[in-house]
């Protein structure tokens, strides 16, 4: 490679990305940059499966705990931060290892951000009124009809992105998918090596997701959400509190669901998140996928990286 290289390690939730990243960092001259839209928030530790203090001591992660849950962090913010952090790491003679499951961030970094129309306040009021009358699920069905690819990537309980996809279509007559495909790649000062890790069997991933959610409940996830609930300045519609698990437990605290129902919905939402992440990964070009259950996972990943940089 003529340019320095950056390694991107992707994968669905609960696939073993963090464990592999820490192992790689201990065997190679890597520094880790988190690619996770939930890990940026301070105090959101249990429900995001934030790496433990022990793991962070072994392999520090950049772009973790950088903003309050009241604040907003966009894909554009991530691109700026990731490029800056990568250049800092490269200047030290080390290799950036970008690790996470927020595929939109990886996509924005590698393929650029599309030039889409500005938000239209009047149209947004109309869409919000429709949602209040019919529900966001009905608007998601509408999106499914004219842009099924975007609908597969946007959850019905993600009103911000759902509203934007409908707004863009009504303003331009073109789908969000159209704009994604028109993106202009950012001119990056480094090459990308793309890898993903996941179990070969989908059932194994589903079991991991369910077990991790129950483990998080045992670790005090409900108390963590309750702390945010009682702050008074956060709402369920903010990006931070829309994160998987937080939204469902917030609804329990609001009296909408019984706790057992909220937990069930949290597990289902986690599996749906994994499905959307896998949808992104299936269309990713030049991606090497590793089995997270392989006993030789670390040497296999290191050998692949070395084969790419020769």
From Swiss-Prot:
It holds the Pfam family IPPT. Residues 36-39, 160-164, 242-247 are annotated as: Interaction with substrate tRNA. It catalyses: adenosine(37) in tRNA + dimethylallyl diphosphate = N(6)-dimethylallyladenosine(37) in tRNA + diphosphate. GO terms for biological process: tRNA modification. GO terms for molecular function: ATP binding; tRNA dimethylallyltransferase activity. InterPro entries: Dimethylallyltransferase, IPT, P-loop_NTPase. Gene3D superfamilies: 1.10.20.140, P-loop containing nucleotide triphosphate hydrolases (3.40.50.300). The keyword ATP-binding applies. It is an enzyme of class 2 (transferase). Keywords: ATP-binding, Magnesium, Nucleotide-binding, Transferase, tRNA processing. SUPFAM superfamilies: P-loop containing nucleoside triphosphate hydrolases. Substrate binds at residues 13-18. Catalyzes the transfer of a dimethylallyl group onto the adenine at position 37 in tRNAs that read codons beginning with uridine, leading to the formation of N6-(dimethylallyl)adenosine (i(6)A). This is tRNA dimethylallyltransferase. The gene is miaA.
């Amino acid at each position: 490679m003529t340019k320095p290289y950056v390694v991107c390690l992707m994968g669905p939730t609960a696939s073993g990305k963090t464990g592999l990243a820490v192992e790689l960092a201990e065997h190679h001259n890597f520094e880790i940059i988190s690619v996770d839209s939930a890990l940026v928030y301070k105090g959101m530790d249990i429900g995001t499966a934030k790496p433990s203090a022990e793991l962070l001591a072994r392999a520090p992660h950049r772009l973790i705990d950088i903003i309050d849950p009241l604040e907003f962090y966009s894909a554009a913010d991530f691109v700026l931060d990731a490029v800056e952090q990568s250049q800092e790491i490269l200047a030290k003679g080390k290799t950036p290892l970008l690790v996470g499951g927020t595929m939109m961030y990886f996509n924005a970094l590698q393929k650029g951000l599309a030039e889409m129309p500005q938000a239209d306040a009047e149209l947004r009021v109309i869409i919000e009124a429709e949602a209040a009358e019919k529900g966001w699920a009905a608007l998601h069905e509408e999106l499914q009809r004219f842009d099924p690819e975007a609908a597969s990537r946007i959850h019905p309980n993600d009103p911000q992105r759902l509203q934007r996809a409908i707004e863009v279509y009504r303003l331009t007559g073109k789908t969000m998918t159209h704009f994604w495909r028109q993106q202009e790649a950012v001119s990056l000062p480094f090459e990308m090596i793309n890898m993903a890790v996941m179990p070969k069997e989908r059932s194994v991933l589903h079991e991991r997701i369910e077990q991790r959610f129950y483990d998080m409940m045992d670790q005090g996830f409900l108390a963590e959400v309750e702390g945010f609930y009682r702050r008074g300045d956060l709402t369920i519609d903010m990006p931070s509190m829309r994160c998987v698990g937080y939204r469902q437990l917030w609804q329990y605290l609001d009296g909408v669901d019984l706790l057992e129902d909220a937990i069930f919905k949290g597990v289902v939402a986690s599996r749906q998140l994994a499905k959307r992440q896998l949808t992104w990964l299936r269309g990713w070009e030049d991606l090497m996928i590793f089995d997270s259950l392989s006993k030789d996972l670390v040497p296999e990943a290191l050998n692949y990286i070395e084969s790419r940089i020769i």
